[in-house]
């Protein structure tokens, strides 16, 4: 795997997460979907959004399995012209829980990520500056395991 294994895996099933629409978000749902959680640093703008667009493109390349990976952006919503339409691709959400804070990007306009299993366990982490193409390989492996 390209991502760093989280040991022990963290159970996110009880972590309170709320979408910007006010509805609760569950990491473990009816569908067997993996969740890629984007953890932006302060002030997600042009560079951060460019990386997230590359992640979305990596998801699209999964073709028929693309719907087996949910994209969740956990933090203050991005801003600027580049953020237009972002919420159509990513689920915008927030949490008061510190469970994933040690994986969050620290630098302004940067983003890190965590891959969560269909069972709600944080399994792999990707620090700020990760390569979306290599992340795509991990996503491909994950959805193949789930089939």
Question: Model-derived features: where do they sit?
Answer:
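Extracytoplasmic/secreted cell-surface and envelope-processing proteins
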Residues: 47, 81-82, 123-124
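Short active-site neighborhood of thiol/selenol oxidoreductases, capturing the structured segment around
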Residues: 29-55
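Short, internal strand/loop/helix patches
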Residues: 69-118
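Conserved beta-strand and immediately adjacent loop positions that scaffold enzyme active sites
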Residues: 14, 35, 112
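N-terminal "domain-start" segment that seeds a small globular fold
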Residues: 1-28
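Conserved helix-turn-beta segment immediately C-terminal to the redox Cys motif
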Residues: 52-73
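Thiol-/selenol-based redox modules, centered on thioredoxin-like
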Residues: 98, 109-110, 115-147
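Extracytoplasmic
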Residues: 31-33, 66-68, 108
